[in-house]
């Protein structure tokens, strides 16, 4: 049976991550995912959030890695040290998360409306990332975002059981207009982000509150 997983949202200015985790626990949910964005948070930092979830007996199904601000994911497609440092940062994340028994991470390949064109520079960097993840026993799920061509490009060119897809239903609806290459991805789906929208904006509505 599939696990229903609730996000530990850690960027709310009025509600702390601890309050969010407590609310999830009191509501009776058993599974969560934690945003591991290296973001300054009120109260518990991101690693402490993982520890607190475990203290309450919550299962952490995966961690979602950061992709913007100090970690500009678009740079992985460009020549230069910045892209290499981004990959190095992810590798360090893997080590820290593996120490806390996290076995699945979700990540984006691009950010924004006009990312660089997909190319072998980015492909080779993701190959390096997958190699390190496999060595320590972590699986990577790539999320379909505004331009799903990047996920298709990487998964077509890296045939590895440790690399798969986090299918985002909302992005599929409003960005891809319900068009997706299921034949390529159907056996490589590691996680699903389930939310709804009006097919125009990425609203993150509850299922059935939109037009999917």
Each predicted region: which residue ranges?
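Acidic-and-aromatic substrate-binding clefts and catalytic sites of carbohydrate-active enzymes
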Residues: 8-17, 34-48, 70-71, 112-117, ...
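Acidic/histidine-rich catalytic cores of soluble enzymes
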Residues: 32, 63, 127-211
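Short secondary-structure boundary segments
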Residues: 36, 109, 196
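Charged helix-capping and loop-helix junction motifs
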Residues: 44-50, 83, 87-88, 119-127, ...
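Active-site acidic/histidine proton-transfer and metal-coordination neighborhood
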Residues: 72-164
């Amino acid at each position: 049976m599939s696990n229903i997983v609730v996000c530990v949202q850690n960027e709310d200015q009025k509600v702390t991550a601890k309050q969010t985790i407590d609310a999830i626990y009191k509501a009776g949910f058993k599974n969560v995912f934690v945003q591991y964005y290296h973001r300054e948070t009120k109260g518990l930092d991101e690693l402490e959030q993982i520890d607190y979830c475990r203290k309450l007996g919550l299962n952490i199904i995966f961690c979602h890695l950061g992709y913007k601000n100090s970690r500009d994911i678009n740079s992985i497609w460009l020549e230069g040290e910045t892209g290499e440092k981004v990959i190095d940062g992810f590798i360090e994340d893997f080590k820290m998360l593996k120490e806390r028994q996290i076995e699945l991470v979700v990540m984006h390949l691009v950010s924004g409306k006009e990312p660089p064109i997909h190319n072998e520079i980015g492909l080779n960097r993701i190959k390096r990332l997958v190699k390190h993840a496999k060595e320590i026993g972590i699986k990577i799920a790539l999320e379909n975002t505004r331009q799903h061509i990047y996920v298709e490009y990487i998964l077509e060119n890296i045939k590895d059981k440790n690399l798969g897809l986090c299918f985002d239903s909302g992005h599929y609806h409003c960005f891809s207009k319900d068009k997706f290459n299921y034949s390529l991805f159907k056996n490589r789906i590691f996680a699903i982000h389930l939310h709804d929208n009006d097919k125009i904006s990425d609203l993150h509505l509850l299922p059935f509150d939109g037009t999917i």
